[in-house]
Amino acid sequence: MKKILACALLSLGLLAPAQAQTVNAGTYDVEGTNLDGSSYSGTATISLTSETTCSIEWSTGSTTSTGICMLYDNAFAAAYVLGDAVGLIVYEVKSDGSLEGAWTISGKNGSGTEVLTPQ
């Protein structure tokens, strides 16, 4: 009886694993807050380099930074260079394809926030 119930549930898709999130290559609108709480905006371009890694470039105002990124389940992380400093941002991949995260820079106190929305 248990086998019949399990088969019935499987056929209905109730025991199927949840779909993994994905991040698409392309251009994203950027909205964020700096370490001091001030806001910034711009664009970010993600280019896939393998099934799990990518490169990312942010352009916010007169600032451009580049980094390497990776996707793991619904977490998307990027390490980047900003001037002479190294930074890290960790995003949560949302069901609508947007990315919501928090970032920091080496040697600085606090963290900023950032949302990337696909264009």
Regions found by a protein language model. Name each.
Residues 1-4:
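Positively charged n-region of N-terminal signal peptides that target proteins for export
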Residues 6-7, 118:
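Short amphipathic alpha-helical "recognition" segments used for binding
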Residues 7-13:
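Bacterial N-terminal signal peptides
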Residues 15-21:
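Bacterial Sec-dependent signal peptides at the C-terminal "C-region" and cleavage site
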Residues 21-119:
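Central antiparallel beta-sheet cores of small beta-barrel/beta-sandwich binding domains
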